[in-house]
Regions:
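A membrane-periplasm/extracellular boundary helix in multi-pass inner-membrane enzymes
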Residues: 3-49, 63-71, 79, 84
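Hydrophobic alpha-helical interface/terminus motif in multipass membrane transporters
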Residues: 82, 86, 130-134, 153
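Hydrophobic transmembrane alpha-helices and their immediate junctions
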Residues: 114-149
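Generic structural signal for conserved hydrophobic packing positions in ordered secondary structure
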Residues: 32, 36, 105-108, 112, ...
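Long extracytoplasmic/lumenal interhelical loops at the membrane interface
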Residues: 48-63, 67-71, 75-115
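Aromatic-anchored segments of alpha-helical transmembrane domains
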Residues: 20-27, 148-157
Length: 199
């Protein structure tokens, strides 16, 4: 919204307001500061002692997933291969390195491990096409844009396209909003053609 509809001065004002609000929330919320401190503590425990922590597990999943991707960068290891790869990597390990999962909690890595760079290109092309579809200013455009941006953002820490509820929310959100947008564009195009070719 900021980049599409505001001039430079208003854009700076909006971004400045966001910075002030985020700063105020940071200082007003002890739980936010505590959660952030916990993440850093868990990261330190993972780095120094291979301790099983929430943040440490995610980092370990991502590290191993990048290693799996490097082993098969072009077309990946195949559909459903993630758990088997983690089982093999956990053999003889202790602590967080012994954890086995079927989902690395990152959409890009989940796709990269199974389908390689080809899959990642398709994933990002899909997101880009959907972002471009919702460039207008109607409610349908904004709903569609919100669904896509939310999915892209949360996919940093999860594989929401492949989670049942979140995946269907994306399909329905983009499908319904996209259908409305495309129908409106087709209607406008038809009106333009008719006005250009009077009977």
């Amino acid at each position: 919204f900021v980049f599409l509809h505001l001039n430079r001065r208003n854009m700076i004002a909006v971004l400045g307001t966001v910075v002030v609000i985020v700063t105020a929330i940071w200082f007003a919320s002890p739980s936010l500061r505590e959660r952030t401190a916990t993440i850093f503590t868990q990261y330190h425990a993972y780095e120094t002692s291979n301790e099983v922590t929430s943040a440490g597990m995610r980092l370990e999943f991502w590290r191993k997933s990048l290693h799996f991707f490097r082993d098969a960068p072009l077309i990946g290891h195949g559909t459903g291969s993630v758990r088997e790869l983690f089982v093999e990597a956990a053999a003889g390990q202790t602590g967080v390195s012994a954890e086995v999962i079927a989902n690395p909690h990152n959409q890009t890595l989940y796709v990269a491990v199974q389908w390689g760079a080809v899959g990642v290109i398709i994933l990002y092309a899909m997101w880009l096409c959907h972002l471009l579809l919702f460039r207008g200013a109607t409610l349908a455009h904004w709903v569609g844009l919100l669904v896509v941006v939310q999915n892209m953002t949360t996919s940093i820490f999860n594989s929401h396209l492949f989670d049942f509820h979140e995946g269907w929310m994306y399909v329905l959100g983009v499908g319904v909003a996209g259908g409305i947008v495309l129908a409106k564009e087709a209607s406008m195009s038809s009106i333009t053609r008719q006005s250009g070719n009077p009977a």
